[in-house]
Structures are given as structure tokens and as C-alpha cells.
Amino acid sequence: RTLIFVHGAGFDHTIWVMPARYFARHGWRVVAVDLPAHGRSQGAALTSIEQLADWLARLIDTVSPNQRASVVGHSMGSLVAMSAAARYAGKVEKLALLGTSAPMPVADVLLNAAKDNDQAAIDMTNTWSHSVGGSLGSSENPGLSNLAVGERLLQQAGPGVFYADLTACNNFKADALELIEQPTLVLIGDEDRMTPARAGLAVVDALHNVQQRRLPGCGHSMLSEQ
């Protein structure tokens, strides 16, 4: 069994350290990817969710050539997972969507700041991504600050990468949802300010074979908060 984790805009594979470790210890072949131009992956940033889904499909051919893979995606990664499931049903077995919304509009003030590689884009994203408790710096991991970790990860993205990601999210159309037949789990943070709970519930309503789980008191950065 192969399980592929896909990160969100501006981030990389390191956000999946704990869940990847868990599933690896429970018999899964785990791949936490760095999308092109993120983390350790080279190349230019891809500018649409469809291009990223094509890239993911090629990755599945490489790591699981004879068997469909399950895909877990957070935020932008959830859009990549949905697009891949809709367009490459023969490659994707199941989905888990965290902090999702379809479409996924991005505020102009954030897009413009990211286009200018302005620190303000990181500050806005970092603040809006956390619940009230999370934005105060609290963490379930002793000695860590959610805000500091999130800021550092976004600062590591190369020039133009965060803007390319946000543009891809902003341009994504929800048409793909009606084509998804794979079993899907949607995780919704009740205090998510980036992809509000109502947006996650709209995705649930649009899918055919779906379960949902609500995370009380959790913001968009659910991987660090819970």
C-alpha cells in the first residue's frame, strides 16, 4: 500500500513528519513529496493545479507502478489530490483532504504581497492559518512555536514560488469534484480562517463517497496544532 502526502502552498514535505512516521510504522509505503521548486525538488514552480496533478500522476507511476496509491493533501495539496483523482482515477485509490475548499479563492492583498516577495505575505498567511490559541504561539510539542515554525518554512520558499502556488489555488475550478468517485475523508478545522468550515462542508456535499471529521478548536495549520 502506497500513501502519498502533498503539502500546501509555500511549504514542503517536512510538514508531514509525524503522520508519515505513523503510517510507515503501520505497514504503508509512505512518500511525502516536495512539489517542483519546493524543499529539495528542483525545477520551476508549476503554475496550475492541473500541472501539479500531472506531476503527481507521473510520481505515482514511479513509486507505485502496479498499484493505485492513496493521496493525502493539505490546502493546495488537497486541490492537487482532487485534480489527480478526477483525471487519473486509475492511479488514485483513496483521498484524504485537510483544510480544503473548492474553489480556493485567495485575497488580492495576499496575492499582491506574494507577487512582490513581501514578508507581509508570510505574516498574513501565518496569522490566518492558526486558530486563536495557535496564533498565540501555543504548541502541543514542547519547546516549539507554531508561528515561528510556519514563518521559517514559508521563508525558505524561493522567489516567486509562494506566488505561483497561491495563483494556482486562486485559479482552480471546482468542476473536478463531480468526477471523483474514490472514497474520501475530509478533515475540517472548526477555527480555520483560510478555508473556513463552511467551505470544507461544501466539498463534502459535492463528493459522492465521503466522510468528514471536525477538529474542534483547530485552525488551518492543523498539522502543527493537532
Segments (PLM) and residue ranges:
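Short beta-strand element of the alpha/beta-hydrolase
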Residues: 1-8
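Active-site loop/oxyanion-hole signature of alpha/beta-hydrolase fold enzymes
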Residues: 17-25, 29-76
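Flexible "cap/lid" loop of the alpha/beta hydrolase fold
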Residues: 79-124
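Conserved alpha/beta-hydrolase catalytic His-Asp/Glu region
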Residues: 112-179
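Short beta-strand/loop motif that positions the catalytic acidic residue
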Residues: 180, 186-188, 192
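Conserved alpha/beta-hydrolase "acid-adjacent" motif
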Residues: 193-199
